[in-house]
Amino acid sequence: GIGIALVANAKGYKSTIVMPETQSREKMDTLRALGAELITVPAAPYSSQCHFVHTSRRIAEETEGAVWANQFDNVANRRAHIETTAEEIWNQMDGKIDGFTCAVGTGGTLAGVGMGLKAKDENVTIALSDPHGAALYEYYAHGELKSEGNSVAEGIGQGRITGNLEDAPIDRQYRISDEEGL
């Protein structure tokens, strides 16, 4: 949302960001300071039509001229990391990379960097670092989307396979504490 608000502000576009009301006050204040209209909704599971992703889609469909970025399922997110982030990491490391890990929000960074690095060297290990309370660790370890516990780490800890995560080359998964994640 912050990236969208930054670009929209610079280009003179209106931006509307929909997010759960459980997000931090600092994030909300930053978005507003960047000129975004902020709509907060109660936290809800993805299966609910009240989930912030579904709410944002509906608002975009009902607003003339609106573009729905859908950063979770729009694979342009992943592609940007294949074409830029992975290239930057590869070049800065002179191609000497054993592995890459990160937590998942949209899935774009992990999947995109993973795909980009694996295209250069299939032996690079790609690992998911998932906080307690998130479901992806269980999915990649045991094939079941199941979450136990909770986390205060904001913006990470996905509970579904997003469009960006589909076909992600994840070799390992780690359960991490909030302290490790932050």
Language-model regions, residue ranges each:
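Active-site-proximal loop->helix
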Residues: 2-61, 132, 136-145, 161-162
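Glycine-rich phosphate/pyrophosphate-binding loop at beta-loop-alpha junctions
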Residues: 3, 11, 46, 74-171
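Hydrophobic beta-strand scaffold residues
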Residues: 15, 38, 67-68, 126
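Short, conserved active-site loop motifs that form the nucleotide-linked donor/cofactor pocket
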Residues: 36, 66, 170-171
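Hydrophobic residues at beta-strand termini and immediately following loops
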Residues: 41, 69, 156, 176
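Phosphate/diphosphate-binding glycine-rich loops and adjacent basic-rich segments that engage nucleotide
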Residues: 58-66, 70
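Short, intrinsically disordered, charge-balanced linker/junction segments flanking boundaries
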Residues: 171, 178-182
